[in-house]
A protein has these predicted regions:
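Extended alpha-helical interface modules used as scaffolds for assembling large macromolecular complexes
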Residues: 74-75, 79, 128-134, 140-304
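Amphipathic alpha-helical segments of the small helical/lid subdomains adjacent to P-loop NTPase cores
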Residues: 64-71, 77-138
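Residues immediately C-terminal
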Residues: 12-15, 39, 62
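Substrate-engagement module of ASCE P-loop NTPases
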Residues: 25-52
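Conserved P-loop NTPase "ATPase switch" module shared by AAA+ and STAND
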Residues: 2-23
């Protein structure tokens, strides 16, 4: 029989290789490993390809990635696509989540689950994170049965299930405008940027702020704001720049965003701003301001 090949998170090795500076070697290795995509062998008895279909999932789009050079007939679906055959497949729908909670007599906590684990929007579907919902039910079902309702908590499960070292490639390369965008997101607002749908890990060395925000969208820290993003922007082909609006999907991700992204990047922004002020003070010969800045830096960054 012909086989279906399922490959989840195909680009994780590429992301780790980028962080440890052996990306080219990993591209060579994976190109060889995925060689069957380019030339599938045929069954000598049926004369049909051994592999019927391959399904890959990953953070970044597969079409332009260098490991897929020579691969044809790729059908790509991203977080901005409107193909409704796929929009409800990536997680639990609202109806599926409510049914699960009812099955375990935990429907009274549907609002808690919605606030913490809902919020992703894929065109026409509102999606819950399955990992979060299942863990919430498993961890709290016994408390519900025993009447210990005060013990029921919405834990942060996403923080322990994801790692995006590629995001930190942008430390020191973002602007004050990007810092403000982070604050806007944490405050519950949407921000806009030019989406790079064809980015791959080769692009990280360019440190384009738009790629930074694109990466956060692709890795789940953000979700598309379909109401604010103009339809004609999403209708553009992949060679065109698309201005999109994004937001943080829920309370769980907001906590992760503040701890993983904003906190780490904000410290760099502070150092960068002090550096600029120090250069200006020295250039102008302003002794008092130079002294004040040095004193501030010593207090912040030196243990005496």
């Amino acid at each position: 029989k012909q086989v279906y090949v399922l490959i989840d998170e195909y680009d994780v090795p590429l992301a780790k290789a980028q962080s440890y500076v052996y990306h080219k070697d990993m591209v060579t290795l994976m190109s060889s490993f995925l060689g069957f995509l380019k030339d599938s062998q045929k069954d000598p008895e049926t004369n049909k390809p051994v592999v019927k279909k391959v399904i890959l999932t990953g953070c970044l789009k597969v079409a332009k990635n260098s490991i897929f050079t020579g691969v044809n007939n790729l059908k790509v679906n991203t977080v901005t696509n409107k193909i409704d055959n796929y929009t409800g497949m990536i997680g639990f729908t609202k109806e599926e989540t409510l049914k699960l909670l009812k099955d375990y007599e935990m429907e009274d906590f549907s609002e808690v689950v919605r606030n913490n684990y809902d919020g992703y929007k894929f065109y026409d579907k509102e999606m819950f994170c399955p990992w979060d919902v299942l863990n919430f039910v498993e961890d709290n079902f016994n408390f519900k049965q025993q009447g210990l309702l005060s013990e029921i908590e919405a834990e942060n499960y996403w923080a322990n299930s994801t790692s995006s070292p590629a995001v930190y490639e942008y430390l020191g390369f973002l602007t004050d405008s990007d810092n403000q965008k982070m604050q806007d997101l944490v405050d519950g607002n949407s921000i806009s940027f030019v989406l790079n749908e064809s980015m791959n890990y080769d692009c990280l060395s360019e440190h384009d702020p738009n790629d930074f925000w694109s990466l956060l969208l692709h890795t789940g820290y953000l979700t598309l704001d379909w109401e604010k993003t103009k339809k004609d922007e999403l209708s553009k082909d992949n060679s065109s720049n698309k201005e999109v609006y994004v937001r943080i999907p829920n309370l769980e991700i907001r906590k992760c965003f503040k701890n993983d992204i904003q906190k780490r990047f904000s410290s760099v922004f502070i150092k960068h701003n002090l550096h600029n002020k120090l250069v200006d003070a020295l250039s102008c010969g302003n002794q008092k301001e130079t002294y004040d800045i040095f004193f501030d830096m010593l207090q912040k960054y030196v243990s005496i």
